[in-house]
């Protein structure tokens, strides 16, 4: 049994639904809170969390009358305590408080804590059989098989909140899983879609941050420029929908209007289209199994004029090829892929390596991991976190060598 519902057969819940938002002050959290703001009376906020943004968290807690708030950074305890004095809102700090927020009774939970820190809170929600809008990549990239199996056993419902996976989720409801022949994830191509390899190699931070279509955080925008983000999405799709690498294709689609397609055995292809606005997939998750009104712009195909598609260039964007390699190697390798990329992106932002060295550091770390024979299956969250930690250390140790080769 899959934790992702491939048929819209869940009964509609009557009355006010309670919601928890993990990562409420981040970009995904901000979009989620905006949707909740427009649907007052339909939802009640149980808990909100943030990393260190006390002011933003307290402002949201007061606005939505949250019952509990949590900060990951323990150094802000006194500031949080003082800001909530007299409100009656419960609060806590540290990992245990974030897990408590996820464990509290809520009908629906947005899992948008970034990084490996989001894994244990998401598992806490899974274990109580919650409906989870999943926006944390690490739950799938670092612990996908384990996470999805645990969700299925607990009766949790996992709804993909990322635009591409939500598109596949919607399209898959048009047929049965055994009728699927492949899924197609689209990619904008990022700011370097038409650049020569030599120019991509030496791209600056400012150039990498100029995404043509989406407004996103700094890290994910750089990942889009390298197509590392699309590689991560390939891995996520495999975990969410129990797909083999050969069942997942990527097409470059510069307009970012078609977000995903599913091909069935009769060669019918069902696509999901929409303006590039993260509030659309989040609204789909928030309203599911119904649909709620969303604030995104109407899709005007006449003004867009044309939709074009290109095959991805694995030579100019090796990060995408590496994702398929890691997926075929196994769960530990996908964890290494993600961890090494985070080290590489941080080094690029700090101007320690060229843009083109991001993928080279990831490849070197993957090769080193495989040579060391570190291929045991992951059986727990602690296993995944340990692999993530060790892979980061390996990538950091390889960084000077990669930087020297590029200089």
UniProtKB/Swiss-Prot annotation:
NADPH binds at residues 25-28, 53, 136, 138, 217. GO terms for biological process: isopentenyl diphosphate biosynthetic process, methylerythritol 4-phosphate pathway involved in terpenoid biosynthetic process. It comes from the Bacteria. 1-deoxy-D-xylulose 5-phosphate binds at residues 137, 163-164, 188, 211, 224, 229-230, 233. InterPro entries: DXP_reductoisomerase, DXP_reductoisomerase_C, DXP_reductoisomerase_N, DXPR_C, DXPR_C_sf, NAD(P)-bd_dom_sf. Catalyzes the NADPH-dependent rearrangement and reduction of 1-deoxy-D-xylulose-5-phosphate (DXP) to 2-C-methyl-D-erythritol 4-phosphate (MEP). PANTHER family: 1-DEOXY-D-XYLULOSE 5-PHOSPHATE REDUCTOISOMERASE, 1-DEOXY-D-XYLULOSE 5-PHOSPHATE REDUCTOISOMERASE, CHLOROPLASTIC. Belongs to the DXR family. This is 1-deoxy-D-xylulose 5-phosphate reductoisomerase. It comes from Nitrobacter winogradskyi (strain ATCC 25391 / DSM 10237 / CIP 104748 / NCIMB 11846 / Nb-255).
């Amino acid at each position: 049994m899959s934790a992702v519902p491939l048929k819209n057969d869940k009964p509609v819940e009557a009355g006010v639904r309670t919601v928890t938002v993990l990562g409420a002050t981040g970009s995904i959290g901000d979009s989620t809170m905006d949707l909740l703001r427009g649907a007052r009376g339909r939802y009640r906020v149980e808990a909100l969390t943030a990393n260190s943004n006390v002011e933003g968290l307290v402002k949201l807690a007061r606005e939505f009358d949250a019952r509990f708030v949590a900060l990951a950074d323990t150094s802000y305890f006194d500031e949080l305590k003082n800001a909530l004095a007299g409100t009656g809102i419960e609060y806590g700090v540290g990992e245990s408080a974030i897990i408590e927020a996820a464990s509290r009774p809520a009908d629906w939970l947005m899992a948008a804590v970034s990084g490996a820190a989001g894994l244990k809170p998401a598992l806490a929600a899974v274990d109580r059989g919650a409906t989870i809008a999943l926006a944390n990549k690490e739950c799938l990239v670092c612990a996908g098989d384990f996470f999805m199996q645990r969700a299925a056993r607990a009766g949790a419902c996992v709804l993909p909140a990322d635009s591409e996976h939500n598109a596949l989720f919607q399209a898959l409801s048009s047929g049965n899983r055994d009728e699927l022949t492949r899924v197609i994830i689209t990619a904008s191509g990022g700011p370097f879609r038409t650049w020569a390899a030599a120019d991509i190699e030496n791209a600056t931070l400012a150039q990498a941050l100029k995404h043509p279509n989406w407004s996103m955080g700094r890290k994910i925008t750089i990942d889009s420029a390298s197509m590392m983000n699309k590689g991560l999405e390939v891995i996520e799709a495999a975990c969410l929908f129990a797909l083999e690498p050969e069942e997942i294709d990527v097409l470059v689609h510069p307009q970012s209007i078609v977000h995903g397609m599913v091909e069935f055995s009769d060669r019918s292809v069902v696509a999901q289209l929409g303006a590039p606005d993260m509030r659309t997939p989040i609204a789909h998750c928030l309203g599911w199994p119904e649909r709620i009104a969303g604030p995104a712009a109407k899709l005007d195909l006449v003004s867009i004029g044309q939709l074009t598609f290109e095959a991805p260039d694995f030579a100019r964007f090796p990060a995408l090829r590496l994702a398929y390699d890691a997926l075929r190697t196994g769960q530990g390798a996908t964890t290494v892929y993600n961890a090494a990329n985070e080290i590489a992106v941080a080094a690029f932002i700090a101007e320690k390596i060229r843009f083109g060295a991001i993928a080279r550091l990831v490849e070197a770390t993957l090769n080193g991991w495989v040579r060391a024979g570190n291929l045991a299956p992951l059986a727990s969250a602690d296993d995944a976190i340990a692999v993530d930690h060790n892979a980061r250390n390996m990538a950091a140790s390889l960084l000077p060598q990669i930087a020297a080769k590029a200089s």
